Amino acid sequence: MSSLFQGMTQQRLFKVAILSSAIHAACSYAASDNTTLALSSDKSTTAESVMTVTAPKLEKQAGSKSTITAADMQRDGGNDFGTIMRYEPGVTATGASGGSSAGKSGFDRAGYTGYNIRGLESNRVDINVDGVSLPDATGRSYVSRAGLDTFGIGRDYIDPYMFGRVDIDKGATSVSQPNTAIGGAVSFRNKTPDDYLHPDKTTYFGYQSDFDSSNRSWHNGITAAAGDEELRGIFVYSRRDGQETQNNDASRGAYPANWHSDALLGSVVWEPNDAHKITGTADFYHKTNHTHYDSWDTSGNTVYGTAQQQSDTRRFGLSLADEYTPYNDFIDSLTSRVYWQHTEAHDNTYMPSSATAYETVYSDYNTDSYGFETNLAKTLGRHELTAGLNGCLEKTERPFRQSPTPSTFSVIMQPEADSRSYTLGGFVQDKINFDLDSHNFAVVPGVRVAYQNTKPENLSSLTSGSSVLTESGVDTLYGSGNSDTQVLPSLAFQYELTPTLMTYLQYKRGAQFPNASQLYGSWNLGSSYAGRAQYALIGNADLDTETSNNFEWGLKGQPTEGVVMNTAVYYNAYKNFIAYNRYTRSGNPNKFTNVPSNIYTTYQAENRDKAYIYGAELSGKVNFGTWYEDVQGLSARFAFSYNEGKSKSSYLGDRYVDLESVPPMKAVLGLGWDAPQNQYGAAVTATFVKGKKATATNRQSYTNTGSALTDSTTDYARVPGYGMVDLTAYWQVAKNVKLSGGVYNLTDRKYWDYLSSREMTSDTAQDRNDIALATQPGRTFQLGVNVDF
């Protein structure tokens, strides 16, 4: 929003603040000269004058970036971590079904684990709230290397009602993004007072209530804002109560669940003068989920009890920011921010430990993040310079215990060491503009330097319950820590084919630093019951950073009046993907220099694989009323994504095999109608997804004894393709009251999400039960009301 502020007085600053989102949508590809816009508010209870705002050209950027607004989320039925991405090409939320054993252990929580963007998922995609990264999903070291790319506690710490928009950055993150990730970023932006206030409207109150039949959930949300040009604030509260998300299988219904959540946000903006805008924000989120589900024996053929689980998720954040716009000879703007974030995840599970006994497993994950970020901008002739610095200190704890004290054979050690990690970074970028026969051409070089240092803490906690493992032994294995510096260049070429249509070619270097689960994830390290056959899974403090080279060509803008489109073709190459290698003390003595003497076989995290992914995306909207007055209000939306990817390990005899995290081809087509003045409207949207079967490999069971890797005989179930139709509508029944709703999966189609079901088999009764649990909801509906003053 700051790009709209350049060269404006305080009065104009405030006038445009609330309307910046609307201006952005309407003018993203406006002509190169300034455009005069007539804007009026539709939220006031009294007639208001039309404001005329002169907005400068908005910056055009290379790369695949998209935004989902709060209005988009409500229109499309996006009311949780996953459904907000319902129609977004190339982006899907991944997760595990309640009570399922697919990708989770009996004490692991169900739900969303993260996002998949163009075939990379979970911790390789940054997820943040106002630029503060949410915690990584926790690894499942306690199931040895079979747990690769599965997670015990996911990254869902949000309530969509709290956000004014969600920004999505596909591919490796840009140099200006402080949180580096090779898979992209999903950025949740909190609501602000400027979203609701302007000089003619100094108060706002909104109430929203919704019901969703897919999980019988009720939502009630309140947004209140007030203030003037100098001082203004906002308060947002959201309450949700629901049950289990229904599956669509006649033989096996979803396991019972009962959950509720509360979210609060308070933010104050103070503009003491024309040069400073100071914003203080506090936000809080808490969700509790109670559920119970079957517990199966190790063969997967007999249910020997019922597990009961309570999961609690909390997030608390504080931030203070200053936007300084002196417009002097040195800088145009300087934005600085400090922040703190605290998160907690607690899973308490009372579950069978055998056919005749029960235990309680306490699995926790706590983090604290402290950070700062500062960015400056300056225009010098044809040069648009930006630069910034950032730093973050993160502390993680992973308490884990069983009660009563388990036997030697069933004890589970703390899954990873507590850790301390600090990250420092800085970037410089220059957009150099040229006039080529009245067409703007820009060269955009940039570079980010990122440094991360991670060390374990409280190593004595890993020795709990062990008679052979000592703190000094763990310190020898992990105590050295891990650090790395990455130089990440980028280069883009942008050319305006017309004043409203741009093409670009872009290269970006990406980096993904190792996380605590990979560095210090451990299992069986303190065991000695198997003698010289004793094995363990261990992390690796010497891991290298995963890296990527990303190439993209795209076309974005308005090719003709009434048509907006974005298209991209890309190729990404990756190396140093982290996985697990098997070593024996007798066959690989050099790998056991720091390994405790009670362990004779290890599964150790290493930089094992390389991969590539290529694909294409297309999205856009057509307004037919631009050409035919009789169908004013009729529009169509479309989106398409296609990806292919393969990976290869360093094992002898291995070859490139389909990368299972790459999603199948997907298309979205919609037709909508909006009456004059948006008094009512309706839309029908169809989603088509191609079927796909994941390819199994023997990489996770390779003995690493010198023989060539053989092909796997495991046969994953094919996830069938599907077509699904959704119907949505709204009606402005009064000036301040709007009804909205939708019917989703109108034809009650039975289908599965490939990314959450790709490794399922039908070998055992439990496997077949998991397949039934993984079916997505059948026909459901949502109904909501908005009251705004």
Sequence positions of predicted segments:
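Transmembrane beta-barrel wall of Gram-negative outer-membrane proteins
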Residues: 211-241, 251-292, 310-325, 433, ...
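Outer-membrane beta-barrel signature, preferentially recognizing the C-terminal barrel domain
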Residues: 303-327, 365, 415, 419-421, ...
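Short acidic/polar hinge/loop motifs at secondary-structure boundaries
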Residues: 115-116, 132-170
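C-terminal beta-signal and adjacent terminal beta-strands/loops
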Residues: 135-138, 511, 575, 688-706, ...
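Extracytoplasmic beta-strand/coil segments of soluble accessory domains associated
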Residues: 82, 86-137
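Flexible loop and strand-edge segments within Gram-negative outer membrane beta-barrel domains
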Residues: 255-257, 275-331, 342-366, 402, ...
